[in-house]
Amino acid sequence: RELRRLHLVEDALERLYNSGRFRLTLAYVLARTGLRPFDLFLMAGEWAEAQGGMQRIGLEAYTACMWTFFRGLKGIEPAGLRDAMACDILHSRRGGFLPACLYREDGRLKKLKRAVAFQAGRGAGGVQRAVVILESRKEKAVVAEYADCDPVTGWYPLELVEVDRLEKSLY
C-alpha cells in the first residue's frame, strides 16, 4: 500500500512539477491551500487514480483533469487558478492555445491578437506571439513571445500588459 502511494506521488510530481508545465499553478495552489508539496502530489495522484488513471492521457485532457481537481481544493479561487494555468501554458507551449477548460470568450481578444501580431511584425517574418486576458484582473493581459526560450527552464518570456494600452497600439 505504501509503495503504491509513493508511485502515485511520483507520477503526479513528474507530470506537474518535473515537466515544467505547471510550476506557476503549483505555486498558486500551494500558497492558497497551505498544503505541503508531498501532500498535494499524493492527493493529486490518488484523485487521478480514482478517475481511472492518467497513464495514457494527453496533455490537454490532463490539464482539464487537474483544473477540476485543483478547483475542488479549499482556498482556491477559480479565476486565479485559471490565470496561473493559462500563464503556465503560455510559458511552456509554443503557440499559446488554451485547452477548452481554460478558454474564456472575450470580445476584446480578437483585437488584442491583432495588436500583438502587428507589434511583432509577424507578417514580415517576425516573432510569433500569443495573448490571454486574465480572468482575475480583466484590465490586464499576458503576452507571450515565442522567439527564444530560456535554456534552463524551457520557458518562453511573458509580459503583463494593460489591455487598454494594447488595444490602443493598433491606432
Descriptions of predicted regions:
Residues 6:
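Conserved, mostly hydrophobic/aromatic
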